Amino acid sequence: MVEEVVLMKGNEAIAHAAIRCGADGYFGYPITPQSEVLETLAELKPWETTGMVVLQAESEVAAINMVYGGAGSGKMVLTSSSSPGVSLKQEGISYIAGAELPCLIVNVMRGGPGLGTIQPSQADYFQTVKGGGHGDYKLIALAPASVQEMADFVALGFELAFKYRNPAIILADGVIGQMMEKVVLPAQKPRRTEEEVIAQCPWAATGKAKGRKPNIITSLELKPEAMEINNLRFQAKYREIEKNEVRFEEINCEDAEYLIIAFGSMARIGQKAMELAREKGIKVGILRPITLWPFPTKAIAAYADKVKGMLVTELNAGQMIEDVRLAVNGKVKVEHFGRLGGIVPDPDEIVTALEEKIIK
């Protein structure tokens, strides 16, 4: 397949991008609002073209453990789900992180808690960036704000996951998953050969250990001293990721007196709110975290002495705002605006919140 421009949903872009970047396998289970990922993969039948395995597992728990096995053999494997489904995967995600294996997870968030609603939400921020499963681990978290980024972040997620031997997650809300936009899809990359996998992943359990010692994939250490050494190594790796992989976008921040800080679809809505505010003479800029972890702490802190206030806008009751407040360390006023239960706000609501909570 050659590079092409297509109109499609964010969920569909995930499926197309996974095939085109040379992924070896997808294991998932349908749940709204991300079901189109699995549906599109089934329609495209990549097992007939690239040899990519696509399997609907019997449950979310089964799917994440299939990913664990595929990742342990050095394969490029991914799964996708939506909020309650990702909760079911948390034990497996922790095991994968503890075994230092690369994989890609996609969460197209819906409203909660509990079964909640199929409408969009951003209420899984804490679960994603603070470690939803047990133990001290981190996920490299990418937050797309367009259908193009949904496609682009598949390849980027795999790249970072293999670079650091750590799971990566694309955290999208239901708006981004369901909206349709023009997407530039890259040309098809071939899947890696078995020889390439062995050469690139010397840690993998491939079943072909000729010329090298066998590998054991595990997160288990019975001796606490050994477990502490493992954990200290993990933490050193996380510090390296924080040093090298922070990504964010700034819009009209040079002369801004106020900042809107938002990710995903709220950053898109916030951009229109910024334009409306500037029409009223209010100098507003947007800072959009692209990596939710590692978080752009230093970038936000740099504005603490430059702006009069920051409004954090999220589709939740206030989660990312905690990291923003930690970043500015009390040097500037930080307030929150959010809608819950699947309600998506208008740009005018954000302007009103800015005027009432920050500017007043």
Where is each model-derived feature located?
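Thiamine diphosphate
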Residues: E36-T128, L142-F162
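Structural signature of the thiamine diphosphate
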Residues: L139-E196, E349-K360
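Peripheral docking tails and interdomain loops at the edges
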Residues: E314-K360
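Conformationally flexible catalytic loops at phosphate/diphosphate-handling active centers
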Residues: R165-E250
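Generic long, charged, amphipathic alpha-helical segments
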Residues: G270-Y303
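N-terminal glycine-rich anion-binding loops that anchor highly charged ligand groups
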Residues: V6-E43
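Glycine-/acidic-rich phosphate or pyrophosphate-binding loops and their flanking alpha/beta elements
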Residues: K9-A13, Q235-Y258, Q271
